[in-house]
Amino acid sequence: MFRHSKVYITRNIKETDFFKTTLEKVGFAVFGESLIEFSAVDFNLNLDVDWLFFYSKNGVRFFFNQLNNNQLEIIKNKKIGTIGSGTAQFLAENYNRKSNFIGTGEPMQTSRAFAQIAAGQKVIFPRAKQSKKSIQQQLSSVLTVIDLIVYENRPKSQIEIPETDILVFTSPMNARIYFKKYDLKSSQKVIAIGHTTGNELLKIGVQNVVAKHPSERGLAEAVLEIKIES
């Protein structure tokens, strides 16, 4: 149906990922590569808290991978919140931990919902050094925010991205890096995973469509919709 159509997503993808398999079934060539490289940041951990709240899969990975056995035992009794279903699924599949709260993926909606169940409690927010802190900034007046940097991200020194019909951006930083090197072609369409990334693209001067849901399924559906309409 969409033979010869090409899509690029700013995320490292596996052959079995839903985004890739769904679009390839209908003829798309799918390219995926993050424009960011990640590294762990050492941290001191105070576990006198009620909740852990994760913004991303990387936040989960760099937090849990640096814990010792004693710390892993202690956090079994802590409640866990995640910004969205993708992070919750990653947490369950890789660390056998169930999320007690799963957000919608959108910071404003997620903040309001989380505030209703965590008000007055202590919450650790493991994050990237360059994070926009989109959830915790909105919650500092209703709960005790414990900020914890567990990794840092920096632009890859060398990137070579093929020209495609559709560009899918999964973070503001990926968007900034891409458009520092490449210009938007008049024929290209742009999709953002959420409003934070969409607003960053607008600041750069790039019009975009925001996916209805910040998941692999939501992104794949956005690609199909934008291609059908074009």
Stretch-by-stretch model annotation:
Residues 1-230:
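Conserved beta-alpha
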